[in-house]
Structures are given as structure tokens and as C-alpha cells.
Amino acid sequence: YLKEHNVEIEDYKNFSKNLKAFSEKDEEVLQISPQANEALYTLASQHTHVIIAPSPVALMKAHKNPTEIAGFRKAMERDGVAMVKFLRWLKDAVKVGEETELSVDEKLYEFRAEQENFKGISFDTIAGYKEHAAIVHYEATPETSIPLKPEGMLLLDSGAQYLDGTTDITRTIVLGPLTEEEKKDYTLVLKGHLQLQNAQFPAGTCGTQLDVLARIAMWK
């Protein structure tokens, strides 16, 4: 199908080399997304005329057809079932005191693997307990994984790939009693989430403009 429409797929590692070769064809015009980095623009513009404009491919991908939308909903429902089973398991398991960041990661994978059309995780799971939750994109390893206790909070950022959709869900799970500081911080973040969730704004408003709503409770 792709060959019939003159589409060629190249190895990603050859991207720079192929871009340079393409740009050296004087008769060619190259369109680059405004989000492209300076290195790509510089490489391409050395030999060819470059147009900076949103990618038509990205726009087509952003417009979902009814089949895709239905698939997303089914994937979300199945992933929701897996998450509910996991949370129920975690509530009992943490009381025993034998679970770690790595073991809950593995258990969540098991619950997802039970679901129809499961193909794998959509990214490496972030299971951060207590201070580890503050590490951006933390990933537990056998060397860093710490045991869970029936206290404090567990940050769980995870997702799955299903044949008909991809999921990404983040939850902050209270495992037991919290300190007063933890309660305050949790409540302030929740207020920010609700402010952003319920915001009404005109078309054309940027995410950076709305970001203040998520932070204003903490600033006060």
C-alpha cells in the first residue's frame, strides 16, 4: 500500500543522512514542523527551500475517525478493569508488608495482561514510593526499589498498549496514615487539579495560560 503511494520507510538512525541527501536535490521543497529542532532546520536549509508549517500528517492523525474513537473507549474500559483489580489487590497486599516498588509494577502488568487485546506497556511504569515520587521519570530497579509500608503515598504512572488503543494513567495512592504536611500538599494539588478540570476558556487559549490555574492554590 505504501509503495503504491510512493511512501518509503527508512531506518530512524539514517534520518540525518537521508535528510541531507534529500535537501541537496535543488528542485525539492521541504516542509518542516514548527516544533522541529534547530539542528534539523539548519541541516535541511543548507541546500533546499524550507517551508515551516504544521505537518499535514500530524493533523490527519489528530483527527480520529469513529473506529479509532470506539477503540480508545474499549481500551480505556479494559485498562480501567485492570486498574480496579490492582488497587483492590494493593489495599490488602500493602498490609502484609512484603511488596516493593518493583513488585507492584510487575503485579500491575499481570492484571493488564489478563485483558483482551493487550500488547504490552505503553511506557516504563513509574512506581515511586515516598521520596521517590518526587524524582521526575523515576524507574525502580533492583538496586533502587524500596519496600512499601501501610503509610505515606505511592505515585503510580503507567499505561498499556492494546490492539485498539493506548492508555496512560497517573494516580497518587494513599497507603496509610499521612503527615500533616503530606495532607496539605495533597489537598493543594487536588485543588489545582479541580480548578483546571472545571476551567472555561475561549478557543485559542494556550496550555501555558491555563497552567496558572493548577498552581494558584499552592502560590497562595
Residue positions per predicted region:
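Active-site neighborhoods and metal-handling regions in enzymes and metal-associated proteins
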Residues: Y1-K220
